[in-house]
């Protein structure tokens, strides 16, 4: 999602690798308007290009979306296809955005933010079927409570599981099992 003037060269380099080896997904790809909006057009073009590669290879995409839900959804709707699916990485949107993402064939990647006091997604996530959720760490960022502000690590995923267990009124083992099945399915493992 970091795009500069030489983004076409960078894309060509990525394409070389995609054609050389087998991968389980294409990503993180997407649009990030948090720091800088000046390269929006280039980000949109790069996103579309990488979506095309994913559709050709029948691979899921992992979407990076920061301050860009409208722009991402516009592209996903125009590229809609049974071969376009994947995960909204580190999902932090609204309930309506969650439903829209799922309607477009995507799962929601849920990590440490669900444990934050003002993260927001804990207010509605249990209205989203667990079959639409995969777990993530976003390591080294976005550590769950009680480690917020510290370097994230994979072992902290248990705190995300614990929070989801409370929100869904299911055992931690059940949350872990169901979300693992979702990940295995989406990445064809």
Enumerate the predicted regions with their spans.
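Mid-domain alpha/beta scaffold segments of enzyme catalytic cores
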Residues: 1-189
């Amino acid at each position: 999602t970091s795009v500069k003037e030489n983004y076409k060269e960078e894309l060509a380099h990525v394409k070389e690798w995609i054609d050389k080896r087998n991968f389980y997904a294409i990503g993180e790809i997407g649009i990030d308007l948090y720091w800088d909006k000046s390269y929006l057009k280039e980000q949109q073009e790069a996103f579309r290009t990488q979506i095309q590669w994913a559709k050709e290879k029948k691979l899921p995409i992992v979407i990076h979306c920061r301050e860009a839900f409208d722009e991402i959804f516009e592209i996903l709707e125009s590229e809609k296809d049974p071969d376009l699916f994947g995960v909204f990485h580190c999902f932090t949107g609204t309930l309506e955005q969650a439903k829209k993402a799922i309607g477009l064939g995507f799962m929601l990647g849920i990590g440490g933010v669900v444990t934050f006091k003002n993260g927001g997604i804990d207010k509605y996530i249990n209205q989203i079927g667990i079959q639409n959720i995969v777990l993530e760490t976003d390591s080294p960022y976005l550590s769950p409570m009680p480690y917020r502000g510290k370097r994230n690590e994979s072992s902290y995923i248990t705190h995300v599981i614990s929070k989801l267990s409370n929100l869904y009124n299911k055992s931690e083992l059940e949350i872990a099992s169901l979300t693992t099945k979702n990940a295995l399915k989406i990445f064809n493992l």
